[in-house]
Amino acid sequence: MDKIEIEEELICSLAVKGEKSIHKLLLNILAIVKQLKTIQSDPVLTYQVSTKAQQQLQSQQLQQPQSIPSSTNNSTNTNTNNSTTTTTTSSTSSTTTPTTTTSTTSPLNSKDSTATTTTKEQPSSPTLPTLNLNFVNDNDKIKELNQNCIQSILALQKTIKEISLLETKISQKPKDNIDNDDTIMKDDNNNSSTSAPTTTTINIEKQDQTSLSNELERLKMDAYQKNCVIKKLIDNMRLLQLSINSMNRTSTGTD
């Protein structure tokens, strides 16, 4: 009976250790999720945003030399229009209205073109450096979370090893029980008066053995669930590492 109680205490202590390790794993997973939420946006999407920003800068650089002759053309048009207005006012008064309208519209168009060019160039410059700085800090934080997860996984491995040792001990028990039964039968043949208490002790030992086997099955299920959680965590960390590598490549390209 003392051995059975000791084994039950060991199983209870292993169950407590397993629950603590699962709790640590869940806390680490929550920390990773919170860290991912603090990132500005999805790394895959930021890769697309950075390429679009580069395309906008290139298109603006191509449009900038074209905007200069447009202003010169507008100035030449205004000069020609002014010359035409002086000639037409001397001849007739009816033709002055279209020339004045064309002369007034040309500087407005030049102002609109300069305003559009200035508004396009403003949002492109501050977006690029903020992304690169944030992802460096995120990478360091995720490394720390990885180390915490590895420590919790090692603790789970220790509990699984202890469970396997208990299983081997319990599998060896039936052989010992058979030997004990043989000795008890011999004693029963010698002393028929003591047969009732020996049978009761055998039944108690069998019940204890069934309870221990049930506890082992429960611990196996807990270990299987932990293994599934660890596999999901490893897959998520691999995807996260791939996204960080892609962002590091884009950051070095933009720099």
UniProtKB/Swiss-Prot annotation:
Residues 58-107, 190-201 have a biased composition (Low complexity). Its main location: nucleus. Residues 177-189 have a biased composition (Basic and acidic residues). Residues 58-133, 177-207 are annotated as: Disordered. The keyword Transcription regulation applies. The keyword Transcription applies. Keywords: Activator, Coiled coil, Nucleus, Transcription, Transcription regulation. Residues 108-133 have a biased composition (Polar residues). Transmembrane segments: none annotated. It is found in: Nucleus. It comes from the Eukaryota. GO terms for cellular component: nucleus. Belongs to the Mediator complex subunit 30 family. Highly divergent. Component of the Mediator complex, a coactivator involved in the regulated transcription of nearly all RNA polymerase II-dependent genes. Mediator functions as a bridge to convey information from gene-specific regulatory proteins to the basal RNA polymerase II transcription machinery. Mediator is recruited to promoters by direct interactions with regulatory proteins and serves as a scaffold for the assembly of a functional preinitiation complex with RNA polymerase II and the general transcription factors. This is Putative mediator of RNA polymerase II transcription subunit 30. The lineage of its organism: Eukaryota, Amoebozoa, Evosea, Eumycetozoa, Dictyostelia.
